[in-house]
Amino acid sequence: MQIILLERIEKLGAIGDEVTVKDGYARNFLLPNKKALRANEANRKVFEANRARIEAENAARRDEAQNESGNVEGKEVVLIRASSNAGQLYGSVSVRDISDALAEQGAKVTKSMIVLERPIKTIGVYDVRVSLHPEVSVTVKVNVARSPDEAELQSKGVNVIDAMFDNETGGFTEEYDPNAEPGEIPTELLEGGEEAAEA
């Protein structure tokens, strides 16, 4: 379907561009949300007549988003979640979790503004893009941890999972006797030492 864009849409175009999109995308998202018009002669005339007003409204929304970006840029949100010993979360972190955490810090962010490139399913620190306006994006840090102490370590740059495995294996050494027969237990490992071996 040919449409005329009423605002800049990522990976499609800018205001006034005529683009072709799939019918379902146009009918179910772009047209109902007033982000586009069907490309026909009547709508072209309506768009050209209102172009200055549409661009002025877009500029006002962009300026408002630019002002809000200072309030959101660089914020760090900490989300405490249950996870396995390997760091796999039981579930995942959703855009709603992130938007709620940002709202608690006073940011005016809706869940539709948060752009997750891929699902967050392990503990760690992630950079998440927040699109306040089609032309204004900022980055926030999302720190997913099992406890507040762990979150503090992660914010200092410590990889908690690697550190945990290093601690577990650091003191572990295996005694190995190359001359031992298979299935034979060395006498010094038996309880009671040599007396137990002689008995």
From Swiss-Prot:
Gene3D superfamilies: Ribosomal protein L9, C-terminal domain (3.10.430.100), Ribosomal protein L9, N-terminal domain (3.40.5.10). Keywords: Ribonucleoprotein, Ribosomal protein, RNA-binding, rRNA-binding. One of its GO terms (molecular function) is rRNA binding. Pfam families: Ribosomal_L9_C, Ribosomal_L9_N. GO terms for biological process: translation. InterPro entries: Ribosomal_bL9 (IPR000244), Ribosomal_bL9/RNase_H1_N (IPR009027), Ribosomal_bL9_bac/chp (IPR020594), Ribosomal_bL9_C (IPR020069), Ribosomal_bL9_C_sf (IPR036791), Ribosomal_bL9_N (IPR020070), Ribosomal_bL9_N_sf (IPR036935). It comes from the Bacteria. GO terms for cellular component: ribonucleoprotein complex; ribosome. Residues 169-199 are annotated as: Disordered. Belongs to the bacterial ribosomal protein bL9 family. NCBIfam families: L9 (TIGR00158). Binds to the 23S rRNA. This is Large ribosomal subunit protein bL9.
